[in-house]
Amino acid sequence: MRRLLTSSLPAAYFAYSHRVAAFSNNLPPLTAVRRLTMTSTSEDLVDVDCNLLHNDLISMMDISSLDFDDIQAPLKILHHPSTRSIKAVISPSSSIEESEQTLSLLQNCTSRERNHMRIKTTVGVHPYSSEEEALTPENLDKLRSMLNDSNNNEIISCIGETGLDYSEGFPDKQYQLKWFKSQLDLAFEFGLPIFLHERLAFEDTLKCIDEAVERHEGQASPKIIVHCYTGTFLECIEYMNRGYYLSVSGFILKKGDDADEVRKCLREGIIPLERLMIETDAPYMGFAGNKDSFFEAEGDSFASLPSKKRKRLKSQYPNTPSSLQLVLEATCNQLNIGLNERCEEMISLDQLAASTTQAATDFFRL
């Protein structure tokens, strides 16, 4: 996740919004979510997007009183007590350099350093890097070299993070389109799933995918996960009709119409549970209270910090993997609002945890 601009809601939404307002008041209060944390799930969770190499995430461990000096810096956060419910992590790459760095990290770390978690990465170029990382034969060969290296077979899960993002501040779409099309071809070439980033570019994204399918007629189409979904209800329906997977993040704990579109997708039950996953997108996609369990685990160490520093650290950014439990609970809340309205059997936190973990295990070959 890089940047996000709001988009308008379809007119049909407002009738729906009026109907559910009395029940959900647009956003379930965070206090209601926190009540669920008193009995957290007994199931293991998978964070399908945690940017372990991001400096702002790594720096969160600078305040920790816990001794992890013998652990490589990007992996220290996985040893924090607040991540104890996580069993596996996908740490996606956004550039050729980051792809190389993450592969090197994961090839050379021990199971103990990983805190016995299963960690995989992706190989690719993010839309944000599409101009800086020029599409040249040499750069494509670098990606192919990583993908052909047998030492990476158990580490690389997908091609990506790739896609299109027409938000303000992103490179011109001419750069994005070239890289996206080339990476779609790589997915067909190597038989790997696609880790898709799409913001405000729904139609062009589908057009590129459809054209790739035509170019590779007769080949099996790669599986696709639309990560950190922030699109509309109608767009989600189309993604689901195509059989894509989808992950939700702390975006559903934010206020606003855009976030309610995603909550509506959950309430209306249009995402099959076997294709629904959860993520933090840390250090991005923070929300109010997202680091509470992190600070609680630090105890007196955090309390002893100067008040200004505590206040700054309690801001929504940077997000940490510790918020995954809250994302799970908020997802469960929204699903159950819809199930209750339809007089259907509601889903427990453990059931949803098991379902999202199974979906991630199947998709990423964990």
Language model regions located:
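Mid-domain alpha/beta scaffold segments of enzyme catalytic cores
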Residues: 4-5, 9, 16, 23-366
